[in-house]
Amino acid sequence: MNIRLLAVFALLTGISLPVRAEGDIEWRHRATQGAVTLSANPLGLASRTAFYSARGFAAEAIRPYAQACGFSFGMQNGGTATLSTRLADWRAVGTDGRAVRLRLPAEWDLQWAKAHVPEAARIAFRWAQFQAENVFEAGDWIMGMATLEAPLSGSFRLVARYHDEKGNHEIVLDKLACGHDSSAN
């Protein structure tokens, strides 16, 4: 793998090199429900701007995405049953009870199309996102980025819903906060 790509990925996910497997990532937030694990790391403006600029986005085009409250998520099915999840069913809930949905990758893609972002950059964006709908067989996992539709101040919780043969379930990540870095000020 290209060392620059690996270094940017490490920066975005907050991991130390060398990266060998998903288990090597130092996740800041992690929760488990049954055999399903959800992990998250907040992402700052500078890291997302650098990541997507290196993939063909003009700085002004990627700015709204980079300024949004964003995370790198990992989800793993450690069980034997198939499960599914839809990003549209996930919510961030502030301490005041205000719920904010996650902005779906297709919504960002519409914005990129209107801004005439090159197709190659848009493909790179889609590949780096937590997919809008996922089906996990036993042992499957996914990593990807996602943003909130609107910022929440202070800490909040993320309620991630998924479905398996036993019904609907939720995993809750508590005490999340939007990532901040010196470039965001």
Language-model-derived ranges and their functions:
Residues 1-5:
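Positively charged n-region of N-terminal signal peptides that target proteins for export
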Residues 6-14:
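Bacterial N-terminal signal peptides
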Residues 16-18:
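N-terminal signal peptide c-region/cleavage motif recognized by signal peptidases
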